[in-house]
Amino acid sequence: MSQSKGMVVLAYSGGLDTSCILVWLKEQGYDVIAYLANIGQNEDFEAARKKAVNLGAKKVYIEDMRQQFVEEYIWPAVQANAIYEDRYLLGTSLARPCIAKKQVEIAKKEAAEYVSHGATGKGNDQIRFELTCYALYPEVKIIAPWRMPEFYNRFRGRSDLMEYAKKHNIPVPVTPKDPWSMDENIMHISYEGGILENPKNHAPPGLYLKTKNPATSPNEPDILEIEFKKGVPVKVTNTKEKTQHSSALGLFCYLNEVAGKHGVGRIDIVENRFIGMKSRGIYETPAGTILYQAHLDVEAFTMDREVRKIKQHLSQRFAEQIYNGFWYSPECEFVRSCITKSQEMVEGKVLVSVLKGQVYVLGREAPHSLYNEELVSMDVQGDYDPADACGFIRINALRLKEFHRLQKSKKN
């Protein structure tokens, strides 16, 4: 019997690609530990465990990461109002460091020298996985089959994988595969590739799994009161049904349910991948969309204007750091600490209506609001003397006058 090349912890999904990779790694002489993270995807985890064992995995770890994913990754993104290129709420990007961190913990526990994943050589996920692994386990060696010529020259497409699967008794799907790829977690579902690579092609009607068609969604809204403390959602109350949810996971799942029912959170975009190419992605982010709108509102109500300007810039950098895979970088740690500081007084309740694919803010209240109703009132003078505006306007007009004086002199 040939000597093992070493132990490798494989980020395993139970799908065709990683099942073939598991067998291929064994074929190359490695002992394989399969690791499957439960981050809220629709998956038969016990079936995946049995499949990995039958394919020859030495051990199988199935880790429930849902609560950790929400509290340690999604909540900081909510606090930041993190959004990539103005539209993408980063569902996949946030999940990757969460998954990879646990993969590293398992590798250290099992004294595994290697980790492996099934991310392609053109996408962002390879970067996100590997930067996390190298940050948290600098000595680790990474096996990325889709970047290895001996693998990608052998498996040039799905048909080659199917043939390999049949040869090695790897169970394959009995139903035809959708002509696109899909990635799901508790925050969102992403769809890309296949027929979606042509940016002119409309999303097929049966594509969306997390949200209903807004056109055929209920005609009556759900009214939700969302309470925040230090920028984190701590309670959701449905004012009609009088139901409440206050645990991080329960709250988020409930918002997914309500938003999905009303078709909230769909986007179809072209984005810039970190490695330089543009890609088309379709995303469903129901709960995240509600929280983004609600948090924006309570933050504007409670945060100083100049602090908010700085925080908005940091939020953009934070979104880029997440998207590009730098969650465990010193710069991302610094930005997170600044955002956490900015949220100290972001406390209050926001009332939203959820209807026909939209989230409407109806009202808000906060114990530490910077909104002064008397000061802003047209009926009460208060501490503000309208005559003071004259000097303010003249000072701000000074540079405008000088600029246009110069422009006029140039023309003459």
UniProtKB/Swiss-Prot annotation:
Instruction: Write down the chemical reaction(s) this protein catalyses.
Output: L-citrulline + L-aspartate + ATP = 2-(N(omega)-L-arginino)succinate + AMP + diphosphate + H(+)
Per the UniProt entry, the signal peptide is none
State where ATP binds. Answer: 11-19, 37, 116-124
Principal location: cytoplasm
Q: What is a single cellular component term in the Gene Ontology annotation? A: cytosol
EC nos? 6.3.4.5
Q: Which domain of life is it from?
A: Eukaryota
Report residues binding L-citrulline: 88, 93, 124, 128, 181, 190, 271, 283
Share an example GO biological-process annotation for this protein: L-arginine biosynthetic process
Q: Which family does it belong to?
A: Belongs to the argininosuccinate synthase family.
- Provide the protein name: Argininosuccinate synthase
Species: Xenopus tropicalis (Western clawed frog)
